[in-house]
């Protein structure tokens, strides 16, 4: 049997969204505590209980920590960017928590991680959104990331 592996950075992105979701949901600003909770979940293999036996999951700890720290350092700017891209009929206070968490992490990686190409960021987070959000929200994630990438000359 061949062993399947999921990209370590992809898992780190999912874990970062989970950490930021936990931050919002629990109103917990202790970044180290949040990171430790999420890391222990993955390191104790709790994430693999519902997966096929031959599927191996591990995350890039450095990428995970970099994403979470960058979100915490830039949270006000990220929220301002998100809120500025909402249409007039959308109230930022009513944005679903998971959607806001995913947007914070994805926009953070898009703007503050120059080593990751914009198209990779857009594709990765659209895929993550596809697994976590409804159809309308998936389209919104794709659209907002594309607009932000264009506005910041990340793609043409």
UniProtKB/Swiss-Prot annotation:
Question: Recorded GO terms, molecular function?
Answer: RNA binding
Q: What is this protein called?
A: Transcription antitermination protein NusB
CDD domains, sorted:
Terminator_NusB
* Purpose of the protein: Involved in transcription antitermination. Required for transcription of ribosomal RNA (rRNA) genes. Binds specifically to the boxA antiterminator sequence of the ribosomal RNA (rrn) operons.
Q: Which GO terms describe its biological process?
A: DNA-templated transcription termination; transcription antitermination
Question: What NCBIfam families does the record tag this protein with?
Answer: nusB
- Which HAMAP family does the annotation name? NusB
Q: Which Pfam families match?
A: NusB
Task: Supply the alphabetized keyword list.
Answer: RNA-binding, Transcription, Transcription antitermination, Transcription regulation
Q: Where is the signal peptide?
A: none
The opening ranks of the lineage are: Bacteria, Pseudomonadati, Pseudomonadota, Alphaproteobacteria, Rickettsiales
Query: Gene behind this chain?
Result: nusB
GO CC terms in record: cytosol
Q: Which family is this sequence assigned to?
A: Belongs to the NusB family.
